[in-house]
From Swiss-Prot:
The keyword Cell membrane does not apply. Keywords: Coiled coil, Nucleus, Ribosome biogenesis, rRNA processing. This is rRNA-processing protein cgrA. Residues 1-96 are annotated as: Disordered. Pfam families: Cgr1. The keyword Transcription regulation does not apply. The lineage of its organism: Eukaryota, Fungi, Dikarya, Ascomycota, Pezizomycotina. One of its GO terms (biological process) is rRNA processing. InterPro entries: Cgr1-like. It comes from Aspergillus terreus (strain NIH 2624 / FGSC A1156). Residues 40-101 form a coiled coil. Belongs to the CGR1 family. The gene is cgrA.
């Protein structure tokens, strides 16, 4: 009896299907890429991906820095233009020497405050 008990515990024969549809292929779990890449290859691909992302991040930061520098140049230019217009408006009302004296005083104050 021990021989008959050990027979059912053995795995079923590959050729015979349980439901009797032997003309169909036996079903297997659908894992097309499972186990195809080794751990070392996955690590290498991950490192490569990280390097690419880091490079992209650096490029983005560089581009953003250029953009901010451009914006700052525009702001500085506009501020200088406004200041010049203000001095011109003052020059219309006052004498030239007094305007120059005020300019110097404002520059001194600006340097002291900054």
């Amino acid at each position: 009896m021990s021989a008959s008990e050990s027979a059912p515990s053995a795995p079923p024969v590959k050729g015979m299907r349980k439901n009797g549809k032997n003309w169909h292929d036996s079903k297997k779990p659908f894992r097309p890429t499972a186990g195809m890449t080794s751990y070392a290859k996955r690590l290498e691909a991950r490192k490569h991906q990280e390097a690419v992302k880091e490079h992209e991040r650096e490029l983005k930061e560089e581009k953003e820095a250029e953009r901010q520098a451009h914006i700052q140049r525009i702001k500085d230019r506009r501020a200088a233009k406004e200041e010049k217009e203000r001095y011109d408006k003052m020059a219309e009302k006052m004498h030239r020497k007094r305007v120059e004296r005020l300019k110097r005083r404002e520059k001194r104050n600006k340097l002291l405050n900054s």
